[in-house]
Structures are given as C-alpha cells and as structure tokens.
C-alpha cells in the first residue's frame, strides 16, 4: 500500500512540475531567456 501511495505522489508531482515548467516557459515577461531554449 505504501508503494502505491509513493507511486501516485510521484506521478502527481511529475505532472505538476511539467505544468509549472510549461507555464513559466510560455511566459516571456517572466522568463525571456526561455525563448532561446524552445527553438
């Protein structure tokens, strides 16, 4: 049961990390240097 809970939390935090990274990368006013990495 503990392994299941750990795996669930890992997936949740993984998607949250991707969502936050994508949000910051798509915000030129907050991170203008991200444009160079997207190309």
Curated annotation (Swiss-Prot):
GO terms for cellular component: photosystem II reaction center; plasma membrane-derived thylakoid membrane. Keywords: Membrane, Photosynthesis, Photosystem II, Reaction center, Thylakoid, Transmembrane, Transmembrane helix. PSII is composed of 1 copy each of membrane proteins PsbA, PsbB, PsbC, PsbD, PsbE, PsbF, PsbH, PsbI, PsbJ, PsbK, PsbL, PsbM, PsbT, PsbX, PsbY, PsbZ, Psb30/Ycf12, peripheral proteins PsbO, CyanoQ (PsbQ), PsbU, PsbV and a large number of cofactors. It forms dimeric complexes. SUPFAM superfamilies: Photosystem II reaction center protein I, PsbI. Its main location: membrane. It comes from Synechococcus sp. (strain RCC307). It is a single-pass membrane protein. GO terms for biological process: photosynthesis. The chain crosses the membrane at residues 6-26. Belongs to the PsbI family. InterPro entries: PSII_PsbI, PSII_PsbI_sf. One of the components of the core complex of photosystem II (PSII), required for its stability and/or assembly. PSII is a light-driven water:plastoquinone oxidoreductase that uses light energy to abstract electrons from H(2)O, generating O(2) and a proton gradient subsequently used for ATP formation. It consists of a core antenna complex that captures photons, and an electron transfer chain that converts photonic excitation into a charge separation. This is Photosystem II reaction center protein I. It comes from the Bacteria. It is found in: Cellular thylakoid membrane.
């Amino acid at each position: 049961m503990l392994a299941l809970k750990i795996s669930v939390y890992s997936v949740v935090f993984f998607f949250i990390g991707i969502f936050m990274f994508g949000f910051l990368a798509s915000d030129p006013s907050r991170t203008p240097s991200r444009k160079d990495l997207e190309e």
